Every structure is written in structure tokens, then in C-alpha cells.
């Protein structure tokens, strides 16, 4: 079943129409989000073009690694990713530094992200490649060291890095999906969508935790009624690399616990339009979730 998406501008307009109180929070990020989306689309189109030779290549999806809970990019060298990261920084840093919280750190951010790539065999590893490895592996000490060397607060570098690394990582994820489709000769699916292939609450590509989940709508397959379904399957979404994956409805994505009473569903009183928060009674984390069966606008 093919998926479609709308523009950043239209998405924000729809959200603000439903939640006017969010306008001053969302509008300042509109240009930045739109630029990130556009660049991710450009890199994805270039890297997944079979006639193109450029772009980084993701590792091959391995069922054995996935069974051990290892995301696709965990431990990947990522050498040379710095080139596309610099391209992303050239486009996104001016918009990032227009934000009040980052304006005073623009020089340090430019020095870090816009330096010429370091790719020689005898050269020290490029800091942008090291940054990507630290973020994808969850290596907090390495990340703090990079922030200290750059003269940036770790939380500030993380905020900027999540925007700047996102377009190249989304292109890598799309290339991994394409490789899986060629291998399995099936469209509109990824290797981690195979039944039981990925059972973790974190992203199968980059290892980040989801920012949102959703329950899908009922669907009808015209060519084969046996493939139709009542909907309600749960999916999670990673904002860093743009990956979606299936997940068990009664399980916490953060701590992995399941069973009766583990996950509580919190809704606002009145017409919630399928919007809710799935809250874990065990680890006290939560995931915003949208039940598309209850939302006719989507």
C-alpha cells in the first residue's frame, strides 16, 4: 500500500488549525523544517538513482544482527559521510543560527560543520564522521569530547546535529530500503518490515527512539480481498533518519516491557481526534500516538 506525504507548510497549517496555541512554537521552525525536508529529498533521489555512482552506501541488512538488537548503522564506519553533512550544514546552518538560542554560537557551529572534509588515509578522522558515529552508537563520552573540542555545550551541538545529520541519514535509510526491495523483489516495504525481523522500540536504521507512533487505518485491497485488514497495526517513526517500523501495541518502546497494565492510554477530554499519549507505567516514558482509525482528516 503506497504511502503519501504532504508538505511541511501544509502539515504545520493543519496542526495549527487544530491547535492554535502551537503557532508561536511551530512557525519559527517552518523554513528550517522545509529546507531539511527538501534536502533529504534531493539526496535520496540522487543516492537511490541506479545510474548515479555518488552517495554513501549503508551496510547490508543482516537478520542475525537485527535479532541481537543491532540497528543497521550501529558500528558502521560512516567514513566520507562528512561530505554530505557539510552540504547539509551549508543549507541549514543559516536557518539554525537564525534561532535565538543558537545565534551566539554561529561561529563555533560553522567552524565545526563547514570545515573542509578530512579524508586522507593518514589523517585524523573527520569530526563530522566522528559525531555521526557517536550519536548513532550512543557514545555519550565521545560526544561530550567533540562538543568540548568545538567549544559548544553538548545539548546545543546535539540540537544542531540532529537537524544537519538528518538529510544524509534519511538518504541512507532510503537506500537501505531500495536494496531490500531489490533483494526481495517487493515494493513499498523494507527489510525490517518482514514479520519478526525487528522487535525493538528503537529505530532499525539509526537506533534513535521514536518521536511518534500511529495505528493504521483499515484498508481494502482491490486485487485480493484476503489482503484487506481492519487496521490498528502500530507503527513508530524516527525523526532523525525518517524510518517507520512496526511495533507491538502493548509494549513500551523504551523499556520493552509488555503485558496488562504496562501501557496506559491518556487522552484529552472531548474530541481527541485519535490523538493520545501512550504512557509506560513501568519506566514512566511516553510516546505521542495518533490512531488514524479515529481521524478522518488524515
Label the predicted regions.
Residues 5-190:
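N-terminal alpha-helical interaction blocks
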Amino acid at each position: 500500500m503506497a504511502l503519501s506525504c504532504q508538505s511541511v507548510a501544509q502539515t504545520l497549517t493543519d496542526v495549527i488549525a487544530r491547535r492554535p496555541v502551537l503557532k508561536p512554537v511551530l512557525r519559527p521552525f517552518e523554513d528550517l523544517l522545509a529546507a531539511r525536508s527538501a534536502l533529504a529529498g534531493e539526496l535520496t533521489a540522487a543516492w537511490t538513482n541506479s545510474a548515479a555512482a555518488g552517495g554513501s552506501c549503508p551496510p547490508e541488512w543482516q537478520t542475525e544482527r537485527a535479532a541481537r538488537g543491532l540497528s543497521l548503522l550501529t558500528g558502521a564506519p560512516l567514513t566520507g559521510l562528512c561530505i554530505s553533512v557539510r552540504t547539509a550544514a551549508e543549507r541549514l546552518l543559516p536557518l539554525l543560527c537564525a534561532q535565538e538560542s543558537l545565534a551566539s554560537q554561529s561561529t563555533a557551529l560553522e567552524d565545526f560543520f563547514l570545515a573542509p572534509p578530512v579524508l586522507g588515509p593518514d589523517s585524523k578522522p573527520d569530526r563530522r564522521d566522528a559525531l555521526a558515529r557517536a550519536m548513532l552508537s550512543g557514545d555519550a563520552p565521545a560526544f561530550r569530547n567533540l562538543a568540548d573540542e568545538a567549544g559548544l555545550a553538548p545539548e546545543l551541538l546535539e540540537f544542531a546535529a540532529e537537524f544537519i545529520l538528518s538529510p544524509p541519514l534519511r538518504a541512507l535509510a532510503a537506500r537501505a530500503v531500495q536494496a531490500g526491495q531489490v533483494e526481495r523483489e517487493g515494493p513499498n516495504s523494507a527489510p525490517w518490515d518482514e514479520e519478526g525481523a525487528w522487535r525493538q522500540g528503537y529505530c532499525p536504521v539509526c537506533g534513535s527512539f521514536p518521536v511518534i507512533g500511529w495505528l493504521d487505518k483499515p484498508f481494502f485491497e482491490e486485487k485480493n480481498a484476503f489482503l484487506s485488514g481492519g487496521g490498528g497495526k502500530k507503527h513508530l517513526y524516527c525523526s532523525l533518519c525518517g524510518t517507520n517500523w512496526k511495533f507491538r501495541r502493548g509494549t513500551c518502546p523504551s523499556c520493552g516491557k509488555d503485558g496488562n497494565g504496562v501501557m496506559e492510554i491518556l487522552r484529552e477530554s472531548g474530541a481527541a481526534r485519535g490523538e493520545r499519549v501512550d504512557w509506560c507505567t513501568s519506566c514512566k516514558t511516553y510516546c505521542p500516538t495518533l490512531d488514524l482509525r479515529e481521524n478522518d482528516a488524515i
